[in-house]
Amino acid sequence: MHRGVGPAFQLSRKMAASGGEPQILVQYLVLRKDLTQPPFSWPAGAVVAQACHAATAALHLHRDHPHTAAYLRELERMRKVVLEAPDETTLKLLAETLQQKNIDHKLWMEQPENIPTCIALRPYPKEEVSQYLKKFRLFK
């Protein structure tokens, strides 16, 4: 079935036509791997829920940003990349770096324990944020 071309795709085509590369918007999440291992041993569903909470919160907090709006207009083309941080310290250091570099994100804290579990960035063109995330591998 043929569908109309969405605004995000049109923006990408305009950029490509003007000599710029098309912007592929990606929402990156960085999830603590140690939560799946002893002494925590959280079930997979609980860890996945943390990533879902963080992603939803980041989208909501930055809902008025043009990248977020474009990302949400193309529901069937959403791209998310889930990376792993080995521990809480690494996750907090990343949050500090993102804050210093003015990269929009949400550090999700599990309540009532106040445990930092996941960072979700708002949707970004991957080339704008890859330098901050390149040391993290895909979550397994």
From Swiss-Prot:
Transmembrane segments: none annotated. InterPro entries: Pep_tRNA_hydro_II_dom_sf, PTH2, PTRHD1. SUPFAM superfamilies: Peptidyl-tRNA hydrolase II. It comes from the Eukaryota. The keyword Hydrolase applies. Its EC number is 3.1.1.29. Keywords: Hydrolase. It catalyses: an N-acyl-L-alpha-aminoacyl-tRNA + H2O = an N-acyl-L-amino acid + a tRNA + H(+). Signal peptide: none annotated. One of its GO terms (molecular function) is peptidyl-tRNA hydrolase activity. Gene3D superfamilies: Bit1 (3.40.1490.10). Belongs to the PTH2 family. PTRHD1 subfamily. As a putative peptidyl-tRNA hydrolase, it might be involved in releasing tRNAs from the ribosome during protein synthesis. Some evidence, however, suggests that it lacks peptidyl-tRNA hydrolase activity. This is Putative peptidyl-tRNA hydrolase PTRHD1. It comes from Bos taurus.
